[in-house]
């Protein structure tokens, strides 16, 4: 959107990032990846359409709508992909773009977006504090004429992080992190360097996994305030938690206690992305716990797989009642989605015997080399190739798989993505 070079640091090696880079390259951007740094040169944009196969790679592909529309005055996209965890309509995105001046029509599953003149500021009230819609509005409005006010905006830390990035590019955004965000449009944005905030859900996942196994863990480069809704849940379960600066340390008891009630809510409430994982943890707690899922209506698909391990969980609508078991037993299970996959890892670590998880390609969307992290924490876990049973040595190859390998120019860089085998985790009890 800036027409300049932007350098993004602390960018994780995830398949969703790979997908975003593919989209940027398709649009005409030059993208160089070196480890956890990504450089994007958007000085030349050659197309304004994104093919269906690229849109379906990830849910957040929809946020390209605002950027492409602002840059080229038109956009052609389809509905995004991502995990199947329930209805996630894009109506808030489309209605917001229309308020900013876009004309949008749908034909054969494709959305055709154009501008009469240019984007203009507007007052937009969201019926739900959608993270993606808030991001899309912020991106488009940053280059619009006039002032845009978002009411009932998402308050997640990622919204504040995006505002910091856009402001670094010359945008004028205030209020990010609160329910009302004000964007004063500017004619010219420029390149910047930006460091992405730590992933709060990744940190939460490892804290929960350590809790489920009665273990101890210290995580650095985390912002404890960003996981403020999880800490009291883990404390109620009997964990001892200390924080200091960008550190958080947890020590779990041999047997967790029940957590009376957890309700997922938009930030700063308990995150829906941690719901499945904490449910796996509570399946080995002492007593009965209740989880109510208020964000997505189909986010208990992992429960059937947890029950194969011996978890005692009953689901009625958006409520799950978890009767803690003293022991789980290893089994063959299938990861239904990203967070459900890590929930199965958590349960497998706490179970007696070996657990084999297939469908783990979902994990690559949100976790960088989780098997390596778990090994560092003392888990007996291997990632193996499904086709020949050999251990997979490298989950991601940062510079080699995407971006510019050493000594190769960005212009000569070819697509180095290899077709990923269907792989799985072998997990032995991590206690």
Regions found by a protein language model. Give the residues of each.
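Short, structured segments at the rim of ligand-binding sites
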Residues: 1-403, 425-431
